[in-house]
From Swiss-Prot:
Binding site for L-homocysteine: I431, G432, S433, E484, D599
Protein name (record): 5-methyltetrahydropteroyltriglutamate--homocysteine methyltransferase
Residues engaged in binding Zn(2+): H641, C643, E665, C726
EC number from the UniProt entry: 2.1.1.14
Gene3D superfamilies: 3.20.20.210
Enzyme class: transferase
Organism, scientific name: Escherichia coli (strain ATCC 8739 / DSM 1576 / NBRC 3972 / NCIMB 8545 / WDCM 00012 / Crooks)
Gene coding for it: metE
Length: 753
């Protein structure tokens, strides 16, 4: 029984973000569709070859996507919302982009589909839309074309397909309500057709992803798996693939399925591999997800070997990444600025492929010398002074309940804030960032490369901040922001100014579509050596009589959008960050900044996948925010911002944050999210986002007014703010001006009644 290895997927954006650049060039009309498609082909060929050279036996095909893999699946099934369809009924790459962005180089603009997080990761997908009586047919053959490409290149191919039950689980019903699970029998023939096409191509194994099987699913959904897979069996071998959690709670459902193998995440799940082996059918292949696909740390391969060795030779076995390597940067070897000690602690996607090759070879030969050599830096890290800071650990241990309590309740604070700011009804503001123009990015890049001295850099940033203030005053906004010209990324910027973080040059991972982020890496105890945002906030406030918000990224979001340490709990990291940012709140307040926004867009996405684990997470997540904010005086108004969220199941925790104002993403869901706040009788102020910043479409005054009137039916108007869904960093100035002018006009119209 020779053990093979494989990955569940590979990063698709390219080491230098080639995919992002090609997409954005195409969207802007600067390149042709064929040029875009060529970049995709080149990236796929390169990535297959890189994995093969690193020692991977079975290459994933179908993990590439032009926007996200759920949207690719929607097109595969012919599930295109009517508003995005071509007049002739055909489907092309612009159809896909219209669903994702609301517009494309061809076709009529229409509201983009809703976007949300992929399970508990920082990757997003476009939510499939389902209507009653919907028909499905094989429409978009990208998967088959890519399999043909890989076969022509001589690769050992393992196609990757999102499973039918998970696909339905991830979607939403539009219009007349019905049970979307009832569509299962309608989509299965398309899956059968795809599997038949793969069988024709001589494919032996298909990786069929059903990550919903790690959730606490309703019984009806669990019951749907057996008939679904009964319908899919027989054409190729199916590797039922799960990740992000363990499968033991749903193992009875899984073992009844007519599949030939099971992939389990042995990093994030608590499954005991020997017990799994005992319970799985003896003729099934077990794919052991031993290498963390979601982090950047070098694996302790001696530990991984010990974890799996007891079942070697007892069944067919593959070793694999825990999940797709999509969530990891591509290649550590191109990082030239990390010092040697720290660099030795990491492994990116290609290094993880090498780890899988080392592990496979050791399991097949019994020789573990190479594993011990690879794992040596991990032992050194455990004792490094780069990791441990006694002062931070002492301060954390000294936290009391008082440290997470504002001096007075919201009603008392609100009165003090009204007296201080004297804002009109329907106060207008933005979420924080303004367009990151080419000039701003060039300025930052020149400074980073040493082509610009500090004085000229600061002068340039100051001018962009001044322009942002002038623009906002001209538009008539009530509460201003400084625009964040100095920030490349809302998490990276803070990480760069906090001890305990390191950064990469090319550690890009995809967030959604063409958006890539370069997450900081938490390597040690976190502290703040000096004020971070105070100077620019104070400067911006000096330019205007209107209040300017101080802008902080909250502790849970910094944690969730970084690669965390694995040697301490997430709670410990979050509270260390909270203490560091607590000092920043105090310094902003002392500098005369009266409104401070602490963004926590990641609070909900950090939830464990199983509801039974939620309470513990929410308890420390809320406490971290409150530790951060509670130092503020009564007349300092604390805002928070959240996006892409379903709030109804965590409203207690949202209220427990005790922010004076919460701004939320609501426009894509047509204010649906406000139902949660209405039903809960949320006591503080709310700014429901009135337009979708992820789309370049400019909303009309009438559209915004209608949304605000809808909001006022749920939340008393005196507690409503008017703002976009999210920051405006990715938009251009012309559409930003137009959209904000309409937003301000809508607010003024409502004030006049």
């Amino acid at each position: 029984m020779t053990i093979l290895n494989h990955t569940l997927g590979f990063p698709r954006v390219g080491l230098r973000r080639e995919l992002k650049k090609a997409q954005e060039s195409y969207w802007a009309g600067n390149s042709t569709r064929e040029e875009l498609l060529t970049v995709g082909r080149e990236l796929r060929a390169r990535h297959w070859d890189q994995q093969k050279q690193a020692g991977i036996d079975l290459l994933p095909v179908g993990d590439f996507a032009w926007y996200d893999h759920v949207l690719t699946t929607s097109l595969l099934l012919g599930n295109v919302p009517p508003r995005h369809q071509n007049k002739d009924g055909s489907v092309d790459i612009d159809t896909l982009f219209r669903i994702g962005r609301g517009r494309a180089p061809t076709g009529e603009p229409a509201a983009a589909a809703e976007m949300t997080k992929w399970f508990n990761t920082n990757y997003h997908y476009m939510v499939p839309e389902f209507v009653k009586g919907q028909q499905f047919k094989l429409t978009w053959t990208q998967l088959l074309e890519e399999v043909d490409e890989a076969l022509a290149l001589g690769h050992n191919v393992k196609p990757v397909l999102l499973g039918p039950v998970t696909y339905l689980w991830l979607g939403k019903v539009k219009g007349e309500q019905f049970d979307r699970l009832s569509l299962l029998n309608d989509i299965l023939p398309v899956y059968q057709q795809v599997l038949a096409e793969l069988a024709k191509r001589g494919i032996e194994w298909v990786q069929i992803d059903e990550p919903a099987l790690v959730l606490e699913l309703p019984q009806a959904w669990l019951d749907a798996y057996k008939p679904a897979y009964d319908a899919l069996q027989g054409q190729v071998k199916l590797l039922l693939t799960t990740y992000f959690e363990g499968v033991t709670p749903n193992l009875d459902t899984i073992t009844a399925l007519p599949v030939q193998g099971l992939h389990v995440d042995l990093v994030h799940g608590k499954d005991d591999v020997v017990e799994l082996h005992k319970r799985l059918p003896s003729d099934w292949l077990l794919s052991a997800g031993l290498i963390n696909g979601r982090n950047v740390w070098r694996a302790d391969l001696t530990e991984k070997y010990a974890q799996i060795k007891d079942i070697v030779g007892k069944r067919d076995l593959w070793v694999a990444s825990s999940c797709s390597l999509l969530h990891s940067p591509i290649d550590l070897s191109v990082e030239t600025r990390l010092d040697a000690e720290v660099k030795s602690w990491f492994a990116f996607a290609l290094q993880k492929c090498h780890e899988l090759a080392l592990l496979r070879d050791a399991l097949n030969s019994g020789d573990t010398a190479a594993l011990a050599e690879w794992s040596a830096p991990i032992q050194a890290r455990r004792n490094s002074t780069r990791v441990h800071n006694p002062a931070v650990e002492k301060r954390l241990a000294a936290i009391t309940a008082q440290d997470s309590q504002r001096a007075n309740v919201y009603e008392v604070r609100a009165e003090a804030q009204r007296a201080r700011f004297k804002l009109p009804a329907w106060p207008t503001t933005t979420i924080g960032s303004f367009p990151q123009t080419t000039e701003i990015r060039t300025l930052r890049l020149d400074f980073k490369k040493g082509n610009l001295d500090a004085n000229n850099y600061r002068t340039g940033i100051a001018e962009h901040i001044r322009q942002a203030i002038v623009e906002q005053e001209r538009l008539g906004l009530d509460v201003l922001v400084h625009g964040e010209a100095e920030r490349n990324d809302m998490v990276e910027y803070f990480g760069e100014h906090l001890d305990g973080f390191v950064f990469t040059q090319n550690g890009w991972v995809q967030s959604y579509g063409s958006r890539c982020v370069k997450p900081p890496i938490v390597i040690g105890d976190v502290s703040r050596p000096a004020p971070i945002t105070v100077e620019w906030a104070k400067y911006a406030q000096s330019l205007t009589d209107k209040p300017v918000k101080g802008m902080l990224t909250g502790p849970v979001t910094i944690l969730c959008w970084s690669f965390p340490r694995e040697d301490v709990s997430r709670e410990t990291i979050a509270k260390q960050i909270a203490l560091a940012l607590r000092d920043e709140v105090a310094d902003l307040e002392a500098a005369g900044i009266g409104i401070i926004q602490i963004d926590e867009p990641a609070l909900r996405e950090g939830l464990p996948l199983r509801r039974s684990d939620w309470d513990a997470y929410l308890q420390w997540g809320v406490e971290a925010f409150r530790i951060n904010a509670a130092v503020a005086k009564d007349d300092t108004q604390i805002h928070t911002h959240m996006c892409y969220c379903e709030f109804n199941d965590i409203m207690d925790s949202i209220a427990a944050l005790d922010a004076d104002v919460i701004t939320i993403e609501t426009s894509r869901s047509d204010m649906e999210l406000l139902e949660s706040f209405e039903e809960f009788d949320y006591p503080n102020e709310i700014g429901p986002g009135v337009y979708d910043i992820h789309s370049p479409n400019v909303p009309s005054v009438e559209w915004i007014e209608a949304l605000l009137k809808k909001a006022a039916k749920r939340i008393p108007a005196e507690r409503l703010w008017v703002n976009p869904d999210c920051g405006l960093k990715t938009r251009g100035w012309p559409e930003t001006r137009a959209a904000l002018a309409n937003m301000v006009q809508a607010a003024q119209n409502l004030r006049r009644g």
